[in-house]
UniProtKB/Swiss-Prot annotation:
Pfam families, sorted: YgbB (PF02542)
Residue(s) at site: Transition state stabilizer: H36, T135
Chain residues that bind 4-CDP-2-C-methyl-D-erythritol 2-phosphate: D10, V11, H12, H36, S37, D58, I59, G60, F63, S64, D65, T66, D67, R144
List of residues binding a divalent metal cation: D10, H12, H44
Keyword line: Isoprene biosynthesis, Lyase, Metal-binding
Cofactor binding note: Binds 1 divalent metal cation per subunit.
Identification of the protein by name: 2-C-methyl-D-erythritol 2,4-cyclodiphosphate synthase
Top enzyme class: lyase
EC number: 4.6.1.12
A molecular function GO annotation: 2-C-methyl-D-erythritol 2,4-cyclodiphosphate synthase activity
Organism (species): Burkholderia ambifaria (strain MC40-6)
Cofactor: a divalent metal cation
GO biological process: isopentenyl diphosphate biosynthetic process, methylerythritol 4-phosphate pathway; terpenoid biosynthetic process
Length: 161
């Protein structure tokens, strides 16, 4: 079997005046993530993990932050397009595991919705998608609440392998 593992990472600054969208879920909070698209840090990390596992580059290669077409883009749409490109390259997505690091707000009440969105967008059963939430124990820029970070891992298998 031809297995491929990909790792993804993203971080965005928290700023006033933007919605906070993580895993396709809008979370009530006084600040949101700054970015060219909707700045969904979790979906961006997963997208990078999938592209990386398939050796297709990264999110910026496919959805450039200098391209006006992606200004304000819904990251769920980008994730679905990523999945289509990975499948077109001959891979089947096996599972995704991810971690969101945020001092605030509390993400636990929103994890089920995030998992459901990701599973739906990737065409996976819910039990193949995991999202964990951690704080940074008040250390560094994440601990000071200046941003939110996400990390993801994805496993692909070459179709027919």
């Amino acid at each position: 079997m031809d297995f491929r593992i990909g790792q993804g990472y993203d971080v965005h600054q928290l700023v006033p005046g933007r919605p906070l969208i993580i895993g396709g879920v809008t979370i009530p909070y006084e600040r949101g993530l700054l970015g060219h698209s909707d700045a969904d840090v979790l979906l961006h990390a997963i997208t990078d993990a999938l592209f990386g596992a398939a050796a297709l580059g990264d999110i910026g290669r496919h959805f450039s932050d200098t391209d006006a077409a992606f200004k304000g883009a819904d990251s769920r749409v980008l994730l679905r397009e990523c999945a289509a490109r990975v499948k077109a390259a001959g891979f089947t997505i096996q599972n995704v595991d991810s971690t969101v690091i945020a001092q605030a707000p509390k993400l636990a009440p929103h994890i089920d919705g995030m998992r459901a969105n990701i599973a739906a967008d990737l065409g996976l059963p819910l039990e193949r998608v995991n999202v964990k939430a951690k704080t940074n124990e008040k250390l560094g820029y994440l601990g000071r609440g200046e941003g939110i970070e996400a990390q993801a891992a994805a496993l692909l298998v070459k179709a027919g392998a």
